[in-house]
Each structure stands twice: as C-alpha cells, then as structure tokens.
Design a protein with these regions (language model features):
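Terminal leader/tail segments of proteins
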Residues: 1-124
Length: 124
C-alpha cells in the first residue's frame, strides 16, 4: 500500500467513527467526513468514493476520468474496505469490475459503468 493510500485509509477510519473533518492530504487528495459516519474521498475535484457506516456500503465512481491514478485509488479503497475483494482491471481501454464468487472462488468480470456499490468489510 502506498503512503497516500494508508493516509486516506486512516482518515476513513476516523470518519466512519463519526469524527467530522475536511482534510486535504496532498494537492490532489482530500477526505471529507460529515460527522455521522459518511466519508467522501475526493481526487482532484472529483468524488471517487463514498463510505457510509449507517448503510455499511462503499460506492466507488470514476467521475468520467478513467486514469491510472483514479483506478489505483479505487483499487486501494476496494481492497481495504469492500467485502469479497473486488477490483478494477482494464482491457483494451475498457474498465471492468472483477469479483470473486464466494462459492466457487471463480473470478468474474463485468464492465464498469462508472459507479459500483459493495458492502463494507467489518471495520469496527
């Protein structure tokens, strides 16, 4: 895990524990918490993830930017916070959501439409 990813993850933990803040971690990364368990991760000026402690859900979105940095941040968030170890891969300029079937352990891919929701891992 890269340093910025671990900083983002630490701020998410604080936000899910209902601490309110608006923290700029680098010139392009920002984490905002509303103090009620909802945390937003922002890359440049685009929201790429929303984690909600009340619904136990993580929603990831690319905001229309399919860049290496966006994919890297989303994959880091998914590996740390989403159940089932989903990830984003790219083949021939198309992004795919890769999920592991819990029964067969087969990896299944479907095209990423710019927004996807997953249940949160147990984080408390």
């Amino acid at each position: 895990m890269r340093v910025i990813d671990s900083k983002i993850s630490a701020m998410i933990t604080k936000g899910l524990n209902k601490e309110k803040f608006d923290r700029k971690l680098s010139k392009r990364d920002r984490v905002v918490s509303d103090g009620h368990g909802k945390v937003r991760v922002i890359l440049w000026k685009t929201e790429i993830a929303v984690l909600d402690a009340q619904t136990d859900e993580i929603i990831v979105k690319n905001g229309g930017f399919e860049s290496v940095t966006t994919k890297s941040r989303i994959n880091s968030l998914l590996s740390e916070w989403a159940q089932g170890n989903p990830g984003i891969s790219q083949r021939k300029w198309v992004w795919y959501i890769d999920e592991v079937c819990p029964l067969t352990r087969d990896r299944k891919s479907k095209e990423f439409q710019g927004l996807a929701a997953f249940p949160l891992k147990v984080w408390r």
